[in-house]
UniProtKB/Swiss-Prot annotation:
This is Bradykinin. One of its GO terms (biological process) is vasodilation. The keyword Cell inner membrane does not apply. Produces in vitro relaxation of rat arterial smooth muscle and constriction of intestinal smooth muscle. May target bradykinin receptors (BDKRB). Its main location: secreted. One of its GO terms (molecular function) is toxin activity. Expressed by the skin glands. One of its GO terms (cellular component) is extracellular region. The modification 4-hydroxyproline is found at residue 3. It is found in: Secreted. Keywords: Amphibian defense peptide, G-protein coupled receptor impairing toxin, Hydroxylation, Secreted, Toxin, Vasoactive, Vasodilator. Signal peptide: none annotated. The lineage of its organism: Eukaryota, Metazoa, Chordata, Craniata, Vertebrata.
């Protein structure tokens, strides 16, 4: 996952 990836967004 790239930095800034939000699994909740």
């Amino acid at each position: 996952r790239p930095p800034g990836f939000s699994p909740f967004r």
